[in-house]
């Protein structure tokens, strides 16, 4: 199991969360709004980051190359997958090009067609699509079962038993 950080970033206005646009300087963004995400990525190594619905400086979070590539991936060193909140994608092709890996709640036939047509028309490079897919494969590898469940349960029973004996 792994953690998913949300909602990346500047998600502070629930009333206008789907249409809001947080206009913020790069300095304030780094010093105030991104600092906790950076710490969580560097220390906690989450499996996923979920984008917020809102825009930051006129670009939706799910399509924001500055937030997803420059800051999250390049500066913070995030290696997991970036996903939208439910219905949080506005331009599927732009989102894939700018750092999104997974659209929630899932991929419909309509969305597959949009991506396929973008590749066929040269609007989305195959390399960009591969780059979007690789983090999902990495997370899948991280979650592979490494031990038998029974062995893990026996380990936990032993460790739970020992402190319990002290209270008897």
What are these regions (language model features)?
Residues 1-168:
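Glycoside hydrolase catalytic-domain context in secreted enzymes
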């Amino acid at each position: 199991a792994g953690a998913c950080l949300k909602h990346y970033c500047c998600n502070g206005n629930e009333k206008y969360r789907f249409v809001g646009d947080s206009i913020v300087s790069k300095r304030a963004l780094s010093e105030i709004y991104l600092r906790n995400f950076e710490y969580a990525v560097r220390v906690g190594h989450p499996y996923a980051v979920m984008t917020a619905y809102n825009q930051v400086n006129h670009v939706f979070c799910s399509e924001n190359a500055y937030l997803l590539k420059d800051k999250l991936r390049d500066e913070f060193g995030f290696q997991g997958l970036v996903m939208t909140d439910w219905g949080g994608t506005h331009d599927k092709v732009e989102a894939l090009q700018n750092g999104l890996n997974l659209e929630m709640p899932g991929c419909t036939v309509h969305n597959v067609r949009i991506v396929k047509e973008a590749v066929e028309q040269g609007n989305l490079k195959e390399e960009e699509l591969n780059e979007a897919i690789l983090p999902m494969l990495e997370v899948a590898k991280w979650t592979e079962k490494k031990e038998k469940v029974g062995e893990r349960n026996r380990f936990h029973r032993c460790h739970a038993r020992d402190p319990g004996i002290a209270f008897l």
